[in-house]
Amino acid sequence: MAKKPIKITEVVLRDAHQSLLATRMTMDEMRPILPEMDKIPYFSVECWGGATFDSCIRFLDEDPWERLRILRKELPHQKLQMLFRGQNMLGYRPYADDAVEYFVKKSVANGIDVIRIFDALNDARNLQTAIKSANKEGAHVQGCISYTLSPVHNNEYYVKYAKTLEEMGANSICIKDMAGLLTPYTCYELVKELKNTLSIPVDIHSHYTAGLASMSLLKGIEAGADIVDTAMSPLSGGTSHMATESPVSYTHLSAMRAASSLVR
């Protein structure tokens, strides 16, 4: 039986410029590429949430909700994805449950399809309201493992936490390696253990800060990861992500799970 092709989440419209350009990309700077991006069969396009909401208001004199509506109109064939900080929403402190519920409701109503939800401390209690609300609104809920290194943060810990998120209602799990600390063989082992334990897809999100991401994602693909996060090459590398062209090219030229349908 043929292996399922690897899927791509494109982060150039959110995490890539948040990492390299302090989230200063304007809507006018995004618009020229959107028609071409809409032709590519991504799993999702991450384009909202994280620091974009704050940056639109604080620095760019833009309405973040209007940005989302424009992206929804310009990318009609894509699943739009946002990053959501659980009980902190898109802010920097915890908010009341009813605020979280209403924000999730309006995010989906204005065009969001996939909500990636994380808590920096991996405290599942801070994700309960967001996961429940996102499921209620019909969004794809992606629960996150916030990856780090410490005496207690090992693969057993992460697999147990991921299983908790699945039981809470997550539709997929993201290994969210914000600092670029995930090494290739650790990634392989972690993905293998997650795939053996979970019944939902596994996504790998790893920043290029330490120069490890391309090798780590490759080993993750070999281990059975379903989705990888990448950024188109002009905004890849550094503190951003592996270039989208890399896994597409490699899987196309090898016997791996080809992502070559993304080639244009």
Segments predicted by a language model, with ranges:
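Active-site-adjacent beta->alpha loops and helix N-cap segments on the catalytic face
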Residues: 60-65, 120-137, 152-156, 180-194, ...
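Active-site beta->alpha loop and helix N-cap motifs at the rims of alpha/beta catalytic domains
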Residues: 52-129, 146-158
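Conserved, mostly hydrophobic/aromatic
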Residues: 16, 117, 173, 224, ...
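Conserved small/polar residues in nucleotide/adenosyl-binding loops
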Residues: 250-256
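Hydrophobic faces of well-ordered beta-strands that scaffold small-molecule active sites
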Residues: 8-11, 45-47, 80-84, 115-116, ...
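Catalytic cores of alpha/beta
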Residues: 160-161, 211-223
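N-terminal small/glycine-rich loop or linker at the start of catalytic domains
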Residues: 2-23, 76-92, 136-149, 194
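Glycine-rich phosphate-binding active-site loops on the catalytic face of alpha/beta enzymes
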Residues: 226-240
